[in-house]
UniProtKB/Swiss-Prot annotation:
GO terms for biological process: 'de novo' UMP biosynthetic process; purine nucleobase catabolic process. Its cofactor is Zn(2+). One of its GO terms (cellular component) is cytoplasm. NCBIfam families: PRK02382.1, pyrC_multi. Pfam families: Amidohydro_1 (PF01979). The gene is pyrC. PROSITE patterns: DIHYDROOROTASE_1, DIHYDROOROTASE_2. InterPro entries: Amidohydro-rel (IPR006680), DHOase (IPR004722), DHOase/Allantoinase_Hydrolase (IPR050138), Dihydroorotase_CS (IPR002195), Metal-dep_hydrolase_composite (IPR011059), Metal_Hydrolase (IPR032466). Zn(2+) 2 binds at residues 146, 180, 234. The active site is at 313. The keyword Zinc-finger does not apply. This is Dihydroorotase. Its EC number is 3.5.2.3. It comes from Methanosarcina mazei (strain ATCC BAA-159 / DSM 3647 / Goe1 / Go1 / JCM 11833 / OCM 88) (Methanosarcina frisia). Keywords: Hydrolase, Metal-binding, Pyrimidine biosynthesis, Zinc.
Length: 456
């Protein structure tokens, strides 16, 4: 007896949309085909012609727990993910306490296991704790980072002299380093130079394109020298995309796999410096909003394969915390619930093809972070039934009052999006009919490769 029978749907297969039915048993996709004769099942979903796609994998969220639960917690953050078609997330380490040793890791893991409704990984923090990285790797962290090369929320930025040593240890462990690339020296110099600037786009001026480009160049040199596997978080500039494209081309020319992957966020794709006046403090994030030339470069990078994936960098703050002062306002915007809907709208608007969007939001993240080994990332037989059912014709404006994050606001207010009708996680419907359909704690911890190898 199947657990779920999805009928009257369409899937992307062999480079085209095709009618299909899907049978799900024990949390896995067991059959994909047409005209199945099923005598009974626990649940039949009539998709009525809507698409069934792999659910999103968001490799960059800040669910703020422990320590900052006024902003978000594992339950509210995971509900936002589910409502947006995300079935797997990877949480970042800049909580209170930061996830930098056994005690803090186990504290976060216990909270996530009690509250999350989606599957999750946990990254380990990297500052001056290089002697703790092996322990964290054996405990099951997904990756290390984001390693902050410049100041950001949580105070986890690494000293310049420790950065290469940390990457060397991550290489020795066979782990993955995820990097927040901004040049701290340049940022501090510009902060002093612009201390009298009160313009709304101050934040983009104090962290300009060159700030990211300098840090990316530095990191690429160390990555190449050490041979460490790395991932660049939230690339945002024309210059950085050009560097990444060149390095990937050189690797391909030598028939080598690049040592690194990279992500871009929806806020760097769909918002720009033109939005500073409208958004004010609600447009402040690190790295900051960019100009139209960078946005065009990011879109081109998505389409030509330079950029590997899209991630939300969901970093919520309450409206009251943002305050009126652009300098004092904390950096970060909510985004996990709007990631997939905005990307689906981009497909509808011919910004990128559906096949590319699927790769960017499911398979590429799964492969880069080792989640493919755990059955994540594809709508295929034997993979986890992590799925979203969506009608691509159903464009609607994003509204803060329809979202589930504790933040209570969104920088994407009024922008067209396509929200899912259903979200499934391991064969369980966790979002349907515009409501959460899951209990806290059903989410599964996805152990990292260090834990898996220890058990082999």
């Amino acid at each position: 007896m199947p657990d779920i029978h999805i009928k009257n749907t369409r899937i992307y297969y062999n480079n085209s949309l095709q009618p299909a039915e899907i049978i799900i048993e024990h949390g896995k996709i067991t059959k994909i085909g047409k005209d199945f004769r099923v005598s009974s099942s626990d649940m039949v979903i009539d998709a009525k012609g809507s698409l069934t796609l792999p659910a999103g994998i968001d490799v960059h969220v800040h669910f703020r727990e422990p320590g900052m639960t006024l902003k978000e917690n594992w339950y509210t953050g995971s509900c936002a993910a589910a409502a947006g078609g995300i079935a797997t997330v990877i949480d970042q380490p800049n909580t209170i306490p930061p996830t930098t040793d056994r005690r803090s890791f186990e504290q976060k893991l216990e909270l996530a296991r009690k509250k999350s409704i989606v599957d999750f990984g946990i990254n380990g923090g990297v500052t001056g704790n290089i002697e703790k990285l092996k322990e964290l790797w054996r405990l099951g962290v997904t990756a290390f980072g984001e390693i902050f090369m410049a100041e950001s929320t949580g105070g986890l930025n690494i000293k310049e002299e420790d950065f290469e040593e940390a990457l060397a240890e991550i290489k020795r462990l066979g782990a993955l380093a995820t990097i927040h690339a901004e040049d701290e020296k340049m940022r501090l110099e510009l902060e002093q130079l612009l201390k009298g600037d009160v313009s709304c786009d101050y934040h983009s001026k104090v962290r300009p394109n060159a700030c990211e480009a300098s840090a990316v160049q530095c990191a690429l040199e160390i990555i190449s020298r050490l041979g460490v596997k790395a991932h660049f978080c939230h690339l945002s500039t024309l210059e950085a995309v050009g560097m990444i494209r060149k390095e990937k081309y050189l690797a391909k020319r030598e028939n080598k796999e690049p040592l690194f992957t990279c992500e871009v966020t929806p806020h760097h794709l769909f918002l720009s410096t033109r939005d500073w006046e409208r958004l004010g403090v609600f447009g402040k994030m690190n790295p900051p909003l960019r100009g139209s030339h960078s946005i065009k470069a990011l879109v081109n990078g998505l389409n030509d394969g330079t950029i590997d994936m899209v991630a939300s960098d969901h970093a919520p703050h309450l409206e009251s915390e943002k305050g009126p002062d652009i300098r004092a306002a904390p950096s970060g915007v909510p985004g996990v619930e709007t990631l997939m809907p905005l990307m689906l709208a981009a497909v509808r608007k011919n910004i990128l093809p559906l096949a590319k969007m699927i790769m960017l939001t499911s398979w590429n993240p799964a492969r880069a972070f080792g989640l493919d080994l755990l059955g994540k990332g594809k709508l295929e037989v034997s993979y986890d039934a992590d799925l979203m059912i969506v009608d691509p014709r159903n464009l609607q404006p994003v509204r803060a009052d329809m979202l589930h994050s504790k933040a209570g606001w969104t920088p994407f207010e009024g922008i067209d999006a396509v929200f899912p009708e259903y979200t499934l996680s391991r064969g369980e419907v966790i979002w349907m009919e515009e409501s959460i359909n899951a209990k806290p704690g059903r989410g599964k911890f996805l152990e990292g490769k260090g834990k898996m190898s220890e058990e082999d």
